[in-house]
Amino acid sequence: MLMPKRVKYRKQQRGRIKGNATRGNTLTYGEYGLQALEPGWITATQIEAARVAMTRYIKRGGKVWIKIFPDKPVTKKPAETRMGSGKGSPEFWVAVVKPGRVLFEIGGVSEDVAKEALRLAMHKLPIKTKFLKREELGGESNES
């Protein structure tokens, strides 16, 4: 499971997710990708479940790139604990995702295989996403 090796501070505030992604919003490595359409937190277990679903479907074919990393700790107090007595201990890690962020990329497979693999990954995630395809440069020209 993904998590930082070490962090400067063990606990963080929740924060707000405002605006669209300005970084990591284009395809970098593969030909196909999965792009977030709404903001949210994606946990390390959800990322791992999506990765396993994709890699099992494409088998030995292509390559999968994970473009997000869970670097935010989420704390939780034990069950049946009274209010007060400080913040709970870190329970799991999340990646903060803004709309437009590319979550996963796939390369080295056909479009049909990539579409189905990313569809399987979509169902493991708590946010709406869309399939992304790399646009080829130098396509049609307007000259007559």
Swiss-Prot record:
The keyword rRNA-binding applies. GO terms for molecular function: rRNA binding; structural constituent of ribosome; tRNA binding. GO terms for cellular component: cytosolic large ribosomal subunit. InterPro entries: Ribosomal_uL16, Ribosomal_uL16_bact-type, Ribosomal_uL16_CS, Ribosomal_uL16_dom, Ribosomal_uL16_sf. Keywords: Ribonucleoprotein, Ribosomal protein, RNA-binding, rRNA-binding, tRNA-binding. One of its GO terms (biological process) is translation. Binds 23S rRNA and is also seen to make contacts with the A and possibly P site tRNAs. Belongs to the universal ribosomal protein uL16 family. PANTHER family: 50S/60S RIBOSOMAL PROTEIN L16 (PTHR12220), LARGE RIBOSOMAL SUBUNIT PROTEIN UL16M (PTHR12220:SF13). Part of the 50S ribosomal subunit. This is Large ribosomal subunit protein uL16.
